[in-house]
């Protein structure tokens, strides 16, 4: 623990900012993991519901996905209820599109923040390094040549510390943002597939 505080003191305010950004990034990653974990679930239940709907057992089809936790389950459940109430055609398609967009927008929340952290952290680290190098050379100049190589090397490694810290913050954030984006894309495709197949089945009956 003492080493961590020493590192924060050595890196100056830039390290403190990066530490706060790291804490924010880890918090966002944890929140998104909880939110996005179930978004690709329910595929088997939706297949069963579509089979039941095609066979004319609409009530059983609705019951099959009533407890679904994925966005595709929610959109399909709404579509089935709307069809039961007689809503069809462009009005239903527009409403399904709107609901699908809302689900995708909800899943995408905070992803931009992760991407921003991944982009800004290395730049902050580089800024800290540049400022540290400037300070080191200023101290060398004030020493008027009396400083030895070890003193100069100590100033340089302290300056490079912020670059390493910036990368340590950015890399997990970038990886998480990419993985989350891929999961969201798959969930969006599941929404489109579920709604489209239901409308196709209903229209062919």
Spell out what each predicted region is:
Residues 11, 15, 103, 107-121, ...:
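Loop-to-transmembrane-helix entry motif
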Residues 15-28, 115-122, 169-173:
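Alpha-helical transmembrane segments of integral membrane proteins
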Residues 40-124, 131, 135-145, 178-205:
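Predominantly long cytosolic amphipathic alpha-helical stalk/bundle segments
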Residues 150-181:
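Pore-lining and gate-forming transmembrane alpha-helices of multi-pass membrane transport proteins
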